[in-house]
Amino acid sequence: MGEALIDIIVTPDGDIDSVVGGGPVNTARAIARLGTKVSFIGGISHDALGKRIRQLLDADNVMCSIDGDCAAPTTLAIASLDEQGAASYQFLIHGTSSLSVTPEIALSALDANATAVHIGTLAFVFTPLSQATRAVVAALDDDQILMMDPNARPAVMENSSEFWETFNSSLDRADVVKCSGDDLDYMFPDLNNLDAARDIHERSHATVLFTDGSQGVHVFMENDYFQCDVPKINVVDTVGAGDSLSGGFLSFWDRYNLKRSDTRDADKIRAAVEFGIKVAGLTCGRAGAMPPFAHELD
């Protein structure tokens, strides 16, 4: 659940390309390409860029839960890449399709049979989408897994109180929280990243996955901590890498019919994280958020 947008990608040399993006869309596409049934709750415009988004989701077998005819223009993100392929973002969001989702629309689109719900990025920040996110979290059944990824974007977070209200209320229900060093730097500027990730776990008792670039993924669980290594790869860019890890994690969970209670099992968490790392690694090896298909991991 969250935003669907177009990423305008600018290379260090000034070359410009565009791809379908938005953290929640990237996550949904990763899940679908791995063969898991998934639906996307988010506003998609009926303009030319919105049609491009919908066509790509259709091609990847991502179901769109909101069928409404959104007249607002498509949300845009400008992703500027540095020499290492890391992206920094600017957004054009006010008055666009991503903010067309109200709590009523989101609740009507929520599938009661969904085994897991993923939330994050701009859905934590801007009303009414943030309000819709909180409504969906409050409506989850006891057996539904909640995975959240704050994916903080300080450049557009004019209202940090809205972010914190959504984050904290969702954290009370969360089973798995994925966060990056950039997220933790923004959220806990007075703590080092490991202490910040540990703090999130201790506040919520959720399993926390701190993605630490080449240092791997640090996992904080009840009475346990471990680190999953990442292989050395040829990085083209990191756009969608964290989203692909989340998608891989959730697809693994579905593939092996794991339950909400299994999020307390360290062996199962480790296996799901390691699978997510493989998915993210393949995504980093190509330009834009282009997660792999299941056969590429065989």
Explain the meaning of each model-derived region.
Residues 1-62:
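Glycine-rich phosphate/adenosyl-contacting loop at the front of the ribokinase-like
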Residues 2-4, 23, 122, 150, ...:
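Active-site metal-binding loops of divalent metal-dependent hydrolases
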Residues 13-18, 94, 262-263:
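Short glycine-enriched, charge-decorated loop/helix-capping segments at active-site entrances
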Residues 37-121, 146:
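Conserved N-terminal subdomain of the carbohydrate kinase-like
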Residues 116, 121-199, 206, 215-216:
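Conserved beta-alpha-beta core of the PfkB/ribokinase-like small-molecule kinase fold
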Residues 189-298:
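Conserved phosphate-binding/catalytic region of the ribokinase-like
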